[in-house]
Amino acid sequence: MAFLSIPSPRRWAALLSLSLGPILGAADATSNSAADYYVRDLPGLPKDGPNIKMHAGHIEVTPESHGNLFFWHFENQHIADKQRTVIWINGGPGCSSEDGAMMEIGPYRLKDKENLYYNNGSWGEFANLLFVDNPVGTGYSLVDTNAYVKELDEMADQFIQFLEKWFALFPQYDRDDIYIAGESYAGQHIPYIAKAILDRNKKNPSKAWNLQGLLIGNGWISPVDQYPAYISFAHEKGIIEKGSDNDKKLQSALRGCERVIASSPGRVDYGECEEILKNILELTRDGNKCINMYDVRLTDTYPSCGMNWPPDLEYLTPYLGRKDVVDALHVTSMKSTGWKECSGAVGGAFTARNSKPAVELLPDLLKEVPVLLFSGAEDFICNHLGTEELISKLEWNGGKGFEVTPGNWAPRRDWTFEGETAGFWQEARNLTYVLIYNSSHMVPFDLPRRSRDMLDRFMGVDISNIGGDPTDSRIDGEKGPETTVGGASNKTQSAAQDHQKQLDEAKWAAYQKSGEVVLVIVIIAAIAWGYFVWRERRKGAAYHALANHDNNSHSNGFRAKSQPGDLESAAFDESELDDLHGSTPATATSARFPVNRNDTREKFVTKYAEPSS
């Protein structure tokens, strides 16, 4: 028979302190700590243009190895029909998402090393933007050098830890429609993160995150389909002539690649297959000039071949290294190596030897989440032919590729933007593919407003309730819903609506938290009251027994029934940001990022790496 052990009255104060302290402390730390991330004055901000609220800093994900992910959050300019958040991650692996923030979809771009200007094509018009340097050690993120991430599952688990803590800090966003976007090797990251979110939601449906879509630009998704596309793309662009001696050399390299894949299937990358692109760049060099592998319309010095692109890198690296910028973004001094666009050490450690390629996750993801794959037509390294090939072979939601009925394929619908041919759209069974003409590996860098129009269409943005002048964007000549706006016509009213909705969301989150804390207080108070009554009655019974010990009258018995309460339930587990401690030694250059021995800079990365200075 089990008995409930009840503490003595003098221990109730201590029990209350121990039980409520972590809960109330976490709630207070969450609300107070959010202010610590507020970016009060980013150096070089333009005097004109919207005033955009920002938060930035580190969140610890692996305390045992001092692993922290750096984030930079920009609040949306307007709320259309609902609140949305786009999470952006760049590729590499090991390349910083500040590329996306400062050169692609963020609200500001660099005019020079000192000054910013407003990006009129920012994806933040109708969505909050959350940029994350992922995995640990990338960009401003940090970790001990012996604890770099090696596998995609490990990366996704750490990202979930980050999101749990981030939403605890900023609960006003945890009911947003969430979209995850990125490019290049993010074609591996994003499906794994999405799967981890969906798995989490199934385990805790009452606190599910509202994942509404994935966007992958020029992604490295399916090696078996994308390696051969190097040669196909070189033929299409006239870089390599079919049947030429150079073509024969490349075909021989491709056969070797295919033998390795056949003998060891299901890997994310193959060193032997990397040689195909490297050989194309070497065979087509003209003196010290070579093709820019991120934009074949351009050239670069050999062996960089695109690593000096885009030109904004000339300003970005020194800007993010400035002390006033580092301080404004709350970057810890423990990031001793400073900001670097791509980390060879992170990329070299991320072997993913036990991870299957993300293409194998897409069929199940497409059952639950819409996916948009978009390709810049002039990118070589993750070119559109490889993406189109993987789609044609992919089986999902009862069909194969874009075949809608036997022998009938979903049409490629012409897309025009402000009177110019922009590309085409193709979609079926929850998958959308967009080819964007006149654009590179980094589509939003080249065509920010078109890329935002693509985003708004995919998210189903409805601007009818805020006014403004929509762009002239048409699919097959039909304008359809007005999705993109250059600026709200009634900015005061729009800003007021935005602010009120933010307040409402924050209030709801606060009410929910307060209700949880009050519930715990009520439970503890009830237990205390019950214990008090039990003690008083027991004292009364003892008094009766002593006073009437010769009187054989009846005696009263008491049975305390109690159901133990979980005072530290997961419902209250919203832990504050752990303190940063420990430094991160400087990282070494990885063998996967070969260098010119006469030049200390990284010169060549694998097919999925982002450009580096």
From Swiss-Prot:
Enzyme class, spelled out: hydrolase
Annotated Gene Ontology cellular component terms: membrane; trans-Golgi network
Subcellular location, principal: Golgi
Record region (Disordered): 466-499, 569-597
UniProt membrane topology term: Single-pass type I membrane protein
Lumenal topological intervals: 28-513
E.C. no: 3.4.16.6
Sites where a glycan is attached: N120, N430, N438, N490
Compartments (UniProt record): Golgi apparatus, trans-Golgi network membrane
Keyword 4Fe-4S: no
Pfam annotation, one family: Peptidase_S10
Active-site residues (renumbered): S184, D379, H441
Transmembrane feature ranges: 514-534
Enzymatic reactions: Preferential release of a C-terminal arginine or lysine residue
Record keywords, A-Z: Apoptosis, Carboxypeptidase, Glycoprotein, Golgi apparatus, Hydrolase, Membrane, Protease, Signal, Transmembrane, Transmembrane helix
GO molecular function, one term: serine-type carboxypeptidase activity
Composition skew (Polar residues), residue ranges: 486-497
Coiled coil start-end: none
Compositionally biased residues, Basic and acidic residues: 471-481
GO biological-process terms attached to the record: apoptotic process; proteolysis
Origin superkingdom: Eukaryota
Secretion signal, residue range per the UniProt entry: 1-27
Record family assignment: Belongs to the peptidase S10 family.
Described function: Protease with a carboxypeptidase B-like function involved in the C-terminal processing of the lysine and arginine residues from protein precursors. Promotes cell fusion and is involved in the programmed cell death.
Protein name: Pheromone-processing carboxypeptidase KEX1
Organism in which the protein naturally occurs: Fusarium vanettenii (strain ATCC MYA-4622 / CBS 123669 / FGSC 9596 / NRRL 45880 / 77-13-4) (Fusarium solani subsp. pisi)
Gene name tied to this protein: KEX1
